[in-house]
Each structure stands twice: as structure tokens, then as C-alpha cells.
Amino acid sequence: MADKEAAFDDAVEERVINEEYKIWKKNTPFLYDLVMTHALEWPSLTAQWLPDVTRPEGKDFSIHRLVLGTHTSDEQNHLVIASVQLPNDDAQFDASHYDSEKGEFGGFGSVSGKIEIEIKINHEGEVNRARYMPQNPCIIATKTPSSDVLVFDYTKHPSKPDPSGECNPDLRLRGHQKEGYGLSWNPNLSGHLLSASDDHTICLWDISAVPKEGKVVDAKTIFTGHTAVVEDVSWHLLHESLFGSVADDQKLMIWDTRSNNTSKPSHSVDAHTAEVNCLSFNPYSEFILATGSADKTVALWDLRNLKLKLHSFESHKDEIFQVQWSPHNETILASSGTDRRLNVWDLSKIGEEQSPEDAEDGPPELLFIHGGHTAKISDFSWNPNEPWVICSVSEDNIMQVWQMAENIYNDEDPEGSVDPEGQGS
């Protein structure tokens, strides 16, 4: 009987999701300046824009690149580099360019040819997460279903993978006992990589160390303060020796690599009432960070007083798995997860007065809800070169590159502005 009920619930949910998606699609011309939807051959659990841009002469677009991965059923997995053509500001943009058949608009007839897979490198198992090294973006670290962290220099691999499926990383980083997701390169110390694991530990490697036989590098330090699965780890963006970690023990920990005690963080705080899945340091404000949790909230923290949670962002209907500050705006951050929504928040609007109708849609700091995904969002990335452009990937193979309409984040023009809550959500 329970099976029947579950099947009925699933069918109802699917219908609701489809209805919401239809509403979203109908409203996209008013809500977005850009929407590109691309179905990948396999779902990607990871997404990160590379920092370089090519601007071909005489064209109305620029070429950006993304690091992606695959999560196949039983076939060969790959680390993937894709290119994306984004229209320049002077490209033709208006709602009349909307193509309802293809579900995209904005100076583009179709996405075909605008998003291309450039490089595929054989990978052992699915790519849980892939992140490039800031000092040399050709170097990419990946988290695998095994305990190894792999490092690839993609310039040393053919763009078409060896059909044998052999995975040939340039380094294998050892130290974990289990798989995981968290991965962070030190922006201030070249080659220093942190990784979080289901084995309750955080490993630190220096990839400039001389590898042992088989291109293996052992962890330089293993941090053992958490008592459960460590979900995410992130270096501080200014202080080369500080990093943060979050775990299923509901804690946020701040560590200092200069300390000799690798089992005790410099700060530990009970951050949420459920597992903490992600964290992000603010790129403009050295004391501010955010954490996202299975308790459906994003929490805002100040390193100078971690006893006090600055704010709790509430609107998600389910677990949050990714949170990222905007690289261009100090007060903007985004979060995503199981509820198929990517929410963009604006700290500067916290506490603003709202009409009762607006309050029904969410708190004043909820700037935008991206409702284009019909499955759990696995990862997303803010484009470092084009403000307000985000790439998000979901479990149903869909990758979307999108930018909310300018009148939503530019308050200057109250005339003709669109209510940002028209999303199907």
C-alpha cells in the first residue's frame, strides 16, 4: 500500500514540477536578460567558470569556458572543459527574440553551437567536484568516488580521450580513507589544496612537493576536529593560513595552519540545527562568511564574533548544498539545493519594509528565484567576467547559463519594472 501512495505522490510532484516549469518558461522574457538551456550527455555534479575570456574580433559574442564533469550510469566518466558563447552588451536583446520552441532568447536563435564540449579527459568514476588552481587555471583537481584526489594539467592531455578509458592524472593525492565533495585551492599560496571527506577529516597537500612513485603525493597535514562527514572546506580569500570547514556534526570550524594542533580548530560553532553542507567567504569583506545547511537556511557569520549568527536566510523548501558570494557585488550571494531552486539574496535589503503581498513571496532580502531547473541543483558558479551571469547544473543533465533582468537588481528605474516574484515557484 505504501508503495502505491509513494507512486501517487511522485506522480503528483512530477505534475506540479511540470506546471511550475511551464509558468517559469512563459515568464522568462520578463525575468531574464539571458537564458541558455543545454542538455549534457550525462549530468554534471560540478560547475566552475574558468577565468579566461576570448573576444573574437567583429563578433557580437565572447567565449567563456567551464569546468564540468560527468556522472554516468556505467560508462566511462570524463573531466570536461566546455566553451560558452555569451552575447556582448550590444548584441540584439529583447523579448521579441524569445524562441518558445527552444526555450531561450536574447539575441540568439538557438543554443546549438553556442555551447560546445572542447576537452574530455578520462576520469576514474564520476567527478564529485572539479576546481581549477587560481595561479594556473590549466591545473584542475577532482574529487572521485575513491579516496584519491586527482590533479590534471589539461594542456598535457589530448582533447579526445583515449578509447581504452585509462585515467592518467598528473598527480594522485593520498590521505583520505573515503570519498567526499569539498575542495579548495589556496588563492594566496600556489599549490596548496584542501579537501573534505566522508572520513571526518580534512587533508592539506602542497602539490609542489616531489611526488613518490606513481605520481603520488601524501597529505602534508590531516585535520581531525569534526566528528562526522566533512561536507565542505574553503580557504579564506585574504589570509593564507586560515580556512573554514563545515560538517554533518552541524558545526562550522575555523582553522589556522600555523597552529600545531591539527585536532582542534581555532574556533568551532554550532552553526545549524542539521548538517552543514557548504560555506563561502565574502570576497570583499574579510570577516564575513555564509554557510548553507540541511535545515533549509543560509546563515551569515562574522569571524570577529562567531557566537552570534548575524542573519538567517529563509525561503528554501529543502536542503541547501551550495552557497556562493557574487564576485562583483559585496552584498549579493546565491544558494541552491534539493528544492530545484537557486535563490539570489541581497544583504542590503535585510529588514526593509514589505507589503503583505510581497511578504508572501519571501523576505525582502530574497532578490530572485531562478526556477528553471526541474531536478535537484548539484552546483553553480558565478561568471567572474560577466556580472550577474550564473551557470547552474542539475541532476537531470540540464545546464543553464542565465542572467536575471537588469531592472531586478538595478533599483534606479521604478518605472516599468517587473515584480521579481513572477517565477513559477
From Swiss-Prot:
Cellular localisation: Nucleus; Chromosome, Telomere
Protein name: Histone-binding protein RBBP4
Family per record: Belongs to the WD repeat RBAP46/RBAP48/MSI1 family.
List of residues that carry N-acetylalanine: 2
Domain of life: Eukaryota
Tissue: Expressed in neuroblastoma cells.
Organism: Homo sapiens (Human)
Effect of residue 43 to A: Loss of interaction with ZNF827 and loss of localization to telomeres
Recorded GO CC terms: ATPase complex; CAF-1 complex; chromatin; chromosome, telomeric region; cytosol; ESC/E(Z) complex; histone deacetylase complex; nucleoplasm
Residues recorded with modification N6-acetyllysine: 4, 160
GO biological process: brain development; chromatin remodeling; DNA repair; DNA replication; DNA replication-dependent chromatin assembly; negative regulation of cell migration; negative regulation of cell population proliferation; negative regulation of DNA-templated transcription
Chief location of this protein within or outside the cell: nucleus
Keyword field contains Repeat: yes
Sequence position, cross-link Glycyl lysine isopeptide (Lys-Gly) (interchain with G-Cter in SUMO2): 4, 160
Keyword field: Acetylation, Cell cycle, Chaperone, Chromatin regulator, Chromosome, DNA damage, DNA repair, DNA replication, Isopeptide bond, Nucleus, Phosphoprotein, Repeat, Repressor, Telomere, Transcription, Transcription regulation, Ubl conjugation, WD repeat
Resulting phenotype, residue 35 to A: Loss of interaction with ARMC12
